[in-house]
Structure formats: structure tokens, C-alpha cells
UniProtKB/Swiss-Prot annotation:
Signal peptide coordinates: 1-20
Organism: Bacillus subtilis (strain 168)
UniProt family annotation: Belongs to the bacterial solute-binding protein 3 family.
Biological processes annotated in GO: amino acid transport
Subunit composition and interactions: The complex is composed of two ATP-binding proteins (TcyN), two transmembrane proteins (TcyL and TcyM) and two solute-binding proteins (TcyJ and TcyK).
Classification via SUPFAM superfamilies: Periplasmic binding protein-like II
InterPro entries: Solute-binding_3/MltF_N
Principal location: membrane
S-diacylglycerol cysteine lipid attachment residues: C21
Disulfide bond positions: none
Listed Pfam families: SBP_bac_3 (PF00497)
Protein name, UniProt field: L-cystine-binding protein TcyJ
Keywords assigned by UniProt, alphabetized: Amino-acid transport, Cell membrane, Lipoprotein, Membrane, Palmitate, Signal, Transport
Amino acid sequence: MNKRKGLVLLLSVFALLGGGCSQTNNKTDRQAQTVIVGTGTDFPNIAFLNEKGELTGYDIEVMKAIDKELPQYTFEFKTMDFSNLLTSLGNKKIDVIAHNMAKNKEREKRFLYHKVPYNYSPMYITVKEDNHKIHTLKDLHGKTVIVGATSNAADYITKYNKTHGSPIHLKYAGQGSNDTANQIETGRADATIATPFAVDFQNKTHAFRQKTVGDVLLDTEVYFMFNKGSQTLADDTDQAIKKLEKNGTLKKLSRKWLGADYSKSSFEK
């Protein structure tokens, strides 16, 4: 009789332990908040499709590393044209943008940034390899510069034109990352403002012959963008970025995807 009671008690203990484990796992699953990460597929080395059609690049891999550091979230990527990213964030179709985004006053009015930049984008004047006349902004007077319509480069040239009598003809690129390079290659534009890693990627993958010239015009701090109500997510992202910077992950990913360590400002090096 005692043996039977002991067996029943033992089975009851196992059942309780099993039930407890199941509840803990389910609770963890329920607590994990799904975060939709909006990004593009045409940004060389940053967010693009590789030869296997897989989404990858510096921003993508940094986001995956952040996801591993934050068990309370599950990140899912949603791709779209760059021109639709801000609208989708504003409409809450996505929760965060990962696409080499810089701050500007207009964006800060509508959206939220975390505090610690995860990358810096040094921007240079970019021309064809056989162009030996353009080296500075003054050399661009009377020339056509092509940039993305909502890019930091567009904002920079627009401000320059306002204070210098609009000497540079500003032209906006169409869809796709190749449009800018194609227009420079064919002579429809004289220059653009780009990063060395983007130029190198285009030269290797599309046989363009272009180069960066002169000094760094901008060394833009790069952030992820959130909706105004996502302060907790932004703060958690900051903590993860600090850890990734400290343990060398950002430097490692930057060197792998961008060819150098851009986790620090060029002006600090």
C-alpha cells in the first residue's frame, strides 16, 4: 500500500514539474514581441539580395545580432522600395526601419531615433574614373549631381545651394540602386555623393568604373528609426548596440560588409 502511494506521489511530482516547464515556455513565447523591420533590397552592402536571393548586408546582420541580444523580441524583415519605408513606418505597417537612415529635422518631427549610432557613412563626391576635373564642391558648380530624393546627400546639396546661389544642378534618381551609377556612366549626370563601400560594390558587381574624390563631405551618423510610441524598443536597441560595440561585433560586421571599420566616425580615426 505504501509503495502504491509512493508511486502516485512520484508521478504527481513529475506531472507538476512537467506542467511547470510547459507554462514557463509558453509564457516566454507569449512575452516575445514581434517587431517588423522594414528594409530594402537594393542598397549595396547594406540591405540587398545576394546571389542566392537571400536578404543580407550590414544593416540586416546588425539587426540579427540585436535580435539575439533581446530575447523579449522576435524580429521579422519586410522588404519594400526605399520610397515606401517612411510611409509604412508612419502607417505602422512596420515597427522599425533598417536602411542606413540618417537624422534630419523633418524626420525627427515624425519619428523616433535611438541614441547610439551603429554606423557612420562617410560621403564623398563620386565621379567616373576618367574624370580628373572634379575634386571639390566648387568643381561641381554648373554640373549635375544626382542623389536620392529623400537622402542625406540631397539635403546636403540643397543646403549648399541655398547659401551659394544654387550653382549645382540637383537631379533625383529613379528606382533601383543602379540608376544613379548608370546616369553617371552614361554622362546624364556628372557626379553623386556616395560612400566608398557603395562605389566599390557597384564597380565589382556591375562593371562600372567610378571613384570617390576629395575629402569627406559628410560623416553621417546612422540610426534605426521607430515610431514615436516605441521608446522602450528604442532604448532596448541602444543597450544591444552598446554591447555589440563593446564585444567587437559591430567592427567585425563593418569590416566584412563595408571593407573597413565604420562603427567609428572618420573624424575620430
